[in-house]
Every structure is written in C-alpha cells, then in structure tokens.
C-alpha cells in the first residue's frame, strides 16, 4: 500500500503547508499515541533541532500524544542519533525528532524511531497514517499523558559518545575546528571533543532559529575550510542541522566526503582484524573509487538506493555492520542504530591518533573518480524517464562518456530538485556532460 503522508525519511515540507502546521502535527501526535495505545503507560521521547518552527511542532505533537494517553519526555535541541540512542536507553516506546536535517529554516519535518532506536517499519508508518484519517478523540482526564523535561539528556549522550572512544587514548595534541551548522549538535559536540583532550575551535555554534545550515555545516564547508587553514588546525569537522551526517576537512583545508571517510573506516577494520567487515554498503551515488578500493582489499561492496534508511535495510539483509553515503551519513552498527556524525568523527580521530597520520594521508587509501553532482530546481513533478528532451540528452551523454563512466538522474526525496550525477575517467568530459544534462533538465521544467 502506498503511503499518503510519510516520505523516505518521515514527514517533511515547508512550514505552514498542508502537513507542517500545528493542526496536522496535533493529529499526528494523537495518531502515534493511538498506535502505541496497546502499550501499558506508553512513553515517547521528543527531540528537535534549532529551527524556530520546532517550538510550534513540539507543542502540537505533545498535545496530541497527551490526548491519546501517552507520556512525553522532552529533550530540547539534540542530534537525531542522540534521540535514537536515548529512546532505547530510557526504554521509551518511541522517539520523535523534529528536524529537516540539512535543509534551511523554512522547512521542517518529523521522523520517528522505534523502541530499539531504529527507524519505523513501513507497516508502522501505514498504521499511523490509518489513525490520522480517523476523527480525533481525547481520552478521559485521568488517562491523559504527562510531559516532563529530560534535563540529563545532554550529559547522557555526551558520555555515550565518549564511551565509543578507546579509554587508553586521548585527543591531546589535536586542534579541531568544529562546525555545528547552527544546529542540534551545537550544545554537545564541542564538549565531547574538548573533554577527550582536543583544542576545540567551535564555529556556527550560535543558533537563532533562522541560521541553521546557512552558509555552514556539512552541505557548505567553505568557511570551515578557511578556518582550518587560518587556525593551523589538524582537522575540521562539519555536521548538518540534525547531526546525523559528517564531512571532514584535512589540515590543507581540503574536503573529505562520506565515501572517503567510509573507506578509511573499512580499511582500518580490515587491517585491525577486529570486527573485520565482510562487506560495506554504499548507494547508487557512491564514488566508483570506493567500490574499487574495497574490492582490492577483498571487501564486498553493494549499492542501495539513496537514503540512510535504505543503506541500513541492505546492511541488515546482508548481515554487515558498516555502510554510508557520499553526503556523510555513515552507519556503524557496532556503535549505533543510525547515522551519527559525532561517533563517526570519533572513529576517524581514533584512526588518526593510533596510526599517527594526518587525515590528508589516510584519505590517500582511496582514489576518487572524477564525479560531478548538479542539483536542478524543479516545480511540480518531472517524469525523467519519459521526457523526450532528457532521453535525448542522456543518449548524447552516454556517447560522450564512451562506456567509461556512470550517469544518474533522480528526483530528491527531500527537496524539489533533480539530482544530476556524472562520473567518469576524464574530469573535463565529466563536467561538460553533467552541465549538458542539467541544462536539458532545466529546459524541460520551463
């Protein structure tokens, strides 16, 4: 059955539209509560990022859950992976995160975790949707849910993250620039690295409700790259608005993406022979260089559709524990149930300290193929497969690559854009081909 409200990662959109408003969020909270009503004294954890609209959505969800007889624990601004961890840790029945991840402040959304800290199954999402379409009824007064602040949430998550770093190792001697994207990680990430001994320069750590992901964070690392060079830092770390993805910067000020970080982690495990990976999951967007490097080390590699949910699904099907995306979502089931930017950063820093090598040297393990990604804004729905102009452009692009590359056009699951990706052996031809395809898509939207 096709879902009516849920997308690839919860429910997301422009604040004030038909879904991201107080009325719908009230009903959504009630619907979630109804699905959990079979649980005795059900409790739901709610966290959020730093968007101004988070207050409205939090209040509406809280009212709906209470009306269904469910208790609520409120953490305030916390990274998405923190809610996944804490939901399981405090034995809550579900966790809710109010966030639109890497999008700017006019957008917001809601995503969910089950009691084990994993994202909801399709069956549960459909059950919630079924309740949304029913008339809302409030339980009697003595069964209303109660709400309480979880003041210890920050401290518990900080200690959990530190527990994933070897106790006989510190970050002393490292200077780290941390870009918090003016998002959910601002109150916890700098403290974690500082408590482990690093000298920390925090940037984009002053959210005002409107500046989340604004010229900062994992999707815009230009300022971080400048600051790493300016401060003569060893490494730069960039999170996105909800802290579940990570991009790093080496001491030369050069960006290190999710494919490279995933490769470093996989090869490290391979040589340590501790939990050596049987295989690694990437996506259809992952650089071919990642696949080639892993196969040289006899590590299997499989591609899933884009989205950390699909990465995790394939990991679980294969029985593998490591996977991720070029964008910086990296899932390590040895530590977490979802992508966690802080924990991924700690693993890379551990490798740097143990190997006594800078990130610039570690990333040399993988040679990236030239790859160009262009996001083309669209209005409405564009059928890529049936559009004659786009089909003609793809045929021409395949001729230009001459069998030595990959072409991928796909609609984003989170933004109104078509993503055009071209990969090949010659950077000039790759860029020219990508720009030609992007122009064809743009022309088709007029």
UniProtKB/Swiss-Prot annotation:
Instruction: Kindly list the positions annotated as binding Mg(2+).
Output: 101, 240, 242, 244
Q: Which GO terms describe its cellular component?
A: cytosol
| Catalytic residues as annotated in Swiss-Prot or TrEMBL | 101 (phosphoserine intermediate)
Asked if the record carries the keyword Lipid metabolism, the reply is no
| GO terms assigned for molecular function | magnesium ion binding; phosphoglucosamine mutase activity; phosphomannomutase activity
Q: Name one GO biological process term.
A: peptidoglycan biosynthetic process
What reactions does this protein catalyze?
A: alpha-D-glucosamine 1-phosphate = D-glucosamine 6-phosphate
Residues the record lists as Phosphoserine modifications: 101
Q: Give the source's domain of life in one word.
A: Bacteria
Cofactors, names only: Mg(2+)
Q: How is it modified after translation?
A: Activated by phosphorylation.
- Which Gene3D superfamilies would you find in this protein's record? Alpha-D-Glucose-1,6-Bisphosphate, subunit A, domain 3 (3.40.120.10), Alpha-D-phosphohexomutase, C-terminal domain (3.30.310.50)
Q: Pfam families of this UniProt entry? A: PGM_PMM_I, PGM_PMM_II, PGM_PMM_III, PGM_PMM_IV
Record note on cofactor: Binds 1 Mg(2+) ion per subunit.
What CDD domains does UniProt report for this protein, alphabetically?
Answer: GlmM
**EC number in record:** 5.4.2.10
Listed A to Z, the keywords are:
Isomerase, Magnesium, Metal-binding, Phosphoprotein
What does the function comment of this entry state? Catalyzes the conversion of glucosamine-6-phosphate to glucosamine-1-phosphate.
HAMAP family in UniProt: GlmM_B (MF_01554_B)
Family, per entry: Belongs to the phosphohexose mutase family.
Q: PANTHER family from the entry? A: PHOSPHOGLUCOMUTASE (ALPHA-D-GLUCOSE-1,6-BISPHOSPHATE-DEPENDENT), PHOSPHOHEXOSE MUTASE
Q: What is this protein called?
A: Phosphoglucosamine mutase
Organism, by scientific name, is Coxiella burnetii (strain Dugway 5J108-111)
Gene giving rise to this polypeptide: glmM
